[in-house]
Curated annotation (Swiss-Prot):
Pathway of action: Purine metabolism; AMP biosynthesis via de novo pathway; AMP from IMP: step 1/2
Organism: Natranaerobius thermophilus (strain ATCC BAA-1301 / DSM 18059 / JW/NM-WN-LF)
GO CC annotation, single: cytoplasm
Residues holding IMP: 13-16, 38-41, 128, 142, 223, 238, 302
Protein name (record): Adenylosuccinate synthetase
Keywords noted in UniProt: Cytoplasm, GTP-binding, Ligase, Magnesium, Metal-binding, Nucleotide-binding, Purine biosynthesis
SUPFAM superfamilies named among the record's database cross-references: P-loop containing nucleoside triphosphate hydrolases
Family indicated by similarity: Belongs to the adenylosuccinate synthetase family.
Length: 429
């Protein structure tokens, strides 16, 4: 039995959904352990493209158990809509388990999210407005509503009445916004509870039993390392921990259960929202990459900022997460350039920096130190074998391995499952 974690190594949007879908064929259980519907995972199967926000991407293989862990914050309405979306596409042969310890996004969380972002003005962090941060704030303040409360009407009513009273004071007195009617909120969430009750269980008990049965377990992170609350580019971060350590806390799984960590690396860099971005491309090359890579947010539709690959970031992510493997994605997007660059260090006030700084003030002053490599101006999207890759593409991959000391074990060069090659064994692949 083996368990693998798929982790984003950059600012999210690395292609974790595709990698999870590919590895899920050998897994009986797929687990999301943090975040909420601020995540957006895209999976292409044949000519069909599926977009998910809450349910793990491995669901498309059928006969899998998908777990939403305690570290998640769940919008019940969004989850029910996603289940309907899957049903309408004929995806029904799966089991769903929702941790009774996962927290519930309430309607006031979304309004507070928007109000707080507006108040920040030019210092906004680029939130998705889904209520993720305020829900995690209530969790940390020990006043949140959990999924387990949905199956206890009395507990749900008491918690919602108290919370709505307090949130209305905040909304009206601080933001000048309209409040909520507690009874309407209670009735709305009772309807959600009726649909979700069968799935709400103690997920950690299930995971222990699955582990003891010898099931293959795959953990799917949302967002990426640089959006991690503790290790990301704070304050431009999410409110949870997408890194490897977050999987144990956010799923209720012991560390010894984890065998391998796959760091998903986009062949170039992207970022949504504000914050420093040393290798950013703001000219024609950046526009070319954005259009060819379809770099627009799955959840927000916002255009992503684009830059060259940054191995200062990759080595930071490697250290934080303990990567055993790299899954390199969107390699085909770089196929039209004569020269490709990799950022290998930063210059800060004349000093060379090789380690990723915690200070956003320092990072904003860092200039990239680039290595240039020859590009390959040929289509690689239809290759069937590793040997068919152009030598320049192989050299690019080899240089990433040299700079990070991690093998590139998976190479993806298009959105479809067939456009993926395994170079080194991960689990049973």
């Amino acid at each position: 039995m083996s368990s693998v974690i798929v982790v984003g190594s950059q600012w999210g949007d690395e292609g974790k959904g595709k990698v999870t879908d590919y590895l899920a064929e050998d897994s009986g259980v797929i687990v999301r352990y943090q975040g909420g519907n601020n995540a957006g995972h895209t999976v292409s199967i044949g000519d069909k493209v599926y977009k998910l926000h809450l349910i793990p991407s491995g669901i498309f293989h059928g006969n899998k158990t998908c777990v939403l862990g305690n570290g998640m914050v769940i919008d019940p309405k969004s989850l029910i809509e996603e289940l309907e979306y899957l049903k309408n596409h004929g995806i029904t042969s799966f089991e769903l388990i929702i941790s009774d310890r996962a927290h519930v996004i309430m309607p006031y969380h979304k309004v507070i999210d928007e109000m707080e972002e507006q108040e920040k003005g030019d210092k906004k962090i680029g939130t998705t407005g889904k209520g993720i941060g305020p829900c995690y704030m209530d969790k940390a303040s020990r006043v949140g509503v959990r999924m387990g409360d949905l199956v206890d009407e009395e507990e749900l009513e008491d918690k919602v009445r108290w919370a709505v009273e307090k949130k209305n004071e905040l909304l009206k007195d601080v933001y000048g916004a309209d409040g909520f009617d507690s009874e309407s909120v209670i009735q709305e969430y009772k309807k959600y509870a009726e649909k979700l009750k069968p799935f709400i269980k103690d997920a950690s008990v299930f995971l222990e039993q699955a582990y003891n049965r010898g099931e293959e377990i795959l953990f799917e992170g949302a967002q990426g390392t640089l959006l991690d609350l503790d290790h990301g580019t704070y304050p431009y971060v999410t409110a949870s921990n997408p890194v490897t350590g977050g999987a144990c806390v956010g799923a209720g799984a012991p560390p010894h259960l984890i065998n391998s960590v796959v760091g998903v690396v986009k062949a170039y860099s992207t970022r949504v929202g504000d914050g420093p971005f040393p290798s950013e491309l703001t000219g024609e090359i950046g526009d070319q990459i954005r259009e060819k890579g379809k770099e627009y947010g799955t959840t927000t539709g916002r255009p992503r900022r684009v830059g060259w690959l940054d191995t200062v970031i990759l080595n930071y992510s490697r250290r934080i997460n303990g990567f055993n493997h790299i899954a390199l994605t969107l390699l085909d997007v770089l196929s039209e350039f004569d020269t490709i660059k990799i950022c290998v260090a930063y210059k800060y006030r004349g000093e060379t920096i090789e380690h990723f700084p915690a200070s956003q003030k320092i990072l904003s002053e860092c200039e990239p130190v680039f290595e240039e490599l020859p590009g390959w101006k040929e289509d690689i999207s239809q290759i069937q074998d590793w040997d068919e890759l152009p030598d320049a593409a192989k050299s690019y991959i080899k240089r990433i391995e040299d700079l990070t000391s991690v093998p590139v074990s998976i190479v993806s060069y298009g959105p479809r499952r067939s456009q993926t090659k395994i170079r080194n064994k991960i689990k049973n692949k």
